[in-house]
Amino acid sequence: MNKGLYLSIIASLTTLSGIFFMINYKNKNKIDRIITISLSIAFINMLLVSIFDIFLNTIKNMPNKAFLSVFIYLVINYTIIYLFLKICHKIKKFKVGEGKLYFLGVINTITLLLHNIPEGIITCTVANINYKLGLKLTSSIIMHNIPEGISIAVPIYYSTKSKKRGFIYVLIAALGEVIGALFSIIFLKSILNQKIIDYMLISVSSIMILIALEEIFPQIISKNKKSVLIGILIGIILFIVNIVIN
């Protein structure tokens, strides 16, 4: 098996860890706390990864003249995503109660799928060039894929009461890594360059930041402050551990 594809599959499997929480926590008194903690982990993790791991590391390698095009690109990205979210909020079933939780799970699935595809492309490409560097990159991905899987599985399961649906949504997001790797192997091997990768990463980081601030933050701000703090601290610890490892 292609080394890059192998590492991408391993990374994608860690996203499925969210299913463990979906299956094992059946006590209704703990449901709200589990959701709050998992969403808080996802919130801080998405912000830290998108800003420090993706955006800042990407633009520092760009020439100064590229900053204007990056700014314009970000504005366009934010506008499109913002309008998409506003349209979704107009849908009646997404307005109240469990509908909001389901909507959050769906949005997290879409966001993380879009995040995982370029991640799979990059992991596969790097690993096939430098396997040791590919291993480091994979360990970084694994650290943030775990809370990402939880942020999909828990909201979907507790809003629909369907384990099957929760599993399917997490699987969709997880397959993004593999899709990206296969896309890299089949189509992008000859045309992929640093500029294309940079703009893909910038696009992904802008999506992650907006989703974290527009969708996840409003969901957790009114919840139990202790649970929110625990989730944020866990997310920060995971991020720091990832930095130390790499």
Please give the residue ranges for each predicted region.
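Intrinsically disordered, metal-sensing/regulatory segments
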Residues: 1-246
